[in-house]
Amino acid sequence: MDTNGIKLTPKDIVSKLNEYIVGQNDAKRKVAIALRNRYRRSLLKEEEKQEIAPKNILMIGPTGVGKTEIARRMAKIVGAPFIKVEATKFTEVGYVGRDVESMVRDLVDVAVRLVKDEKKSLVKDEATKKANDKLVKLLVPSLKKKAAQGNNPLENLFGGAIPNFGQNQDEEEEPPTEEIKTKRSEIKKQLEQGKLENEKVRIKVEQDPASMGMLGTNQNQQIQDMMNQLMPKKKVEREVSVETARKILADDFADELIDQETANQQALELAEQMGIIFIDEIDKVATNNQNSGQDVSRQGVQRDILPILEGSMIQTKYGTVNTEHMLFIGAGAFHVSKPSDLIPELQGRFPIRVELESLSVEDFVRILTEPKLSLVKQYEALLQTEEVTVNFSEDAIQRLAEIAYQVNQDTDNIGARRLHTILEKMLEDLSFEAPSMPNAVVDITPQYVDDKLKSISTNKDLSAFIL
């Protein structure tokens, strides 16, 4: 986890969010305060810590205005485990479908991956050295010893598939001769100089366990985990390049070098203290009519989510995790329903409310130009790989923003995502022809934009389908 990130002041956090997200200052301020409060809580005495729960946030605003991106970027700034789920994917306990506890298990999986990646980075040099030593032996193998063992009758019955658990599965090798030692020394130098990266080598890799798809999602996962622990891991041979083999072997050696149990415990603590769960489309499970069966089911999902927000002990394959100090961010457009349509207990668990504004033409202009890797910069970089230089004029960017805004007004308002569809449509011909026009320079002007888009953007029926 990035310990420096969590110490950032709210101003610093907002400043970092501004590098990627345009506008929505109120939302940025509130998530920055929530993040800073976590740091403040970490400095308190243990008994004080237990009394202070995070203030969950409810974001209200149309799609494409930055709700998810603000939460995701915030988590990335501090290296906190983050998971996005959709409330509509869950079903009430007792029905077929995902139960709400699965989002906590998914968060723990993310935390485990974060912790293990960090620990692996600390032993990367040692793991890479071991991987290179192994590669040298694979490229210049010793003679194999003949296996002195009789046939197991069960092997014939099961097609030779009975593993010999009592013995080492790798074939034993003869001690290397002087000639082999000399060759290995030469190969080692060539490996260090990067001369053998494209050479092919055969290595043994763990085979992915077969999926058990006939059961429901959660039952499937639990039984799959149990079977994976009981059954020995099967390895298969693959022919890969030296470069790929080094990555695979280094990852395997890094796994062996880190303490798995300690890593799992640290991941559980990280998920408990720093985990962020983003519940999207929470407005879709809100209801103001409790008569229909569908509304009763939606209310059931709300009641299932409630204990997790209040603090529950959830069993995962890595151990039990407490949700009491996780930060939950609910989000929804609330076009049809209102936050007050959520059950009162759930409303009370989202004390911080923030309304995100719809995007204006000026916002679209800023989105196209200001972020660290804005959409315009992305397309310029992509086409530059084909040696095609694309230059967007300020007037062209203004025209693109106006068209995006107008199409959003005339059809469904999908916020900044409209810019993706419009840019893709405008640059479709150029992207197709780019490989055959090296060293070309293309100036994107308002006239170019209109030639490619005006006939579509002015026709509401066409723009509804194409843009």
From Swiss-Prot:
One GO biological-process annotation of the entry reads: protein unfolding
Q: Which cysteines are joined by disulfide bonds?
A: none
Q: Kindly list the places in or outside the cell where this protein is found, as annotated in its UniProt entry.
A: Cytoplasm
Provide the binding site for ATP.
22, 64-69, 280, 345, 417
Keyword Glycosyltransferase assigned to the entry: answer is no
Query: What terms describe the molecular function in GO for this protein?
Result: ATP binding; ATP hydrolysis activity; peptidase activity; proteasome-activating activity
Q: Where is this region: Disordered?
A: 166-185
| Summary of the function given for this chain in its UniProt record | ATPase subunit of a proteasome-like degradation complex; this subunit has chaperone activity. The binding of ATP and its subsequent hydrolysis by HslU are essential for unfolding of protein substrates subsequently hydrolyzed by HslV. HslU recognizes the N-terminal part of its protein substrates and unfolds these before they are guided to HslV for hydrolysis.
Oligomeric state and partners? A double ring-shaped homohexamer of HslV is capped on each side by a ring-shaped HslU homohexamer. The assembly of the HslU/HslV complex is dependent on binding of ATP.
Q: What is this protein called?
A: ATP-dependent protease ATPase subunit HslU
Organism of this sequence: Staphylococcus epidermidis (strain ATCC 35984 / DSM 28319 / BCRC 17069 / CCUG 31568 / BM 3577 / RP62A)
Tell me what gene encodes this.
hslU
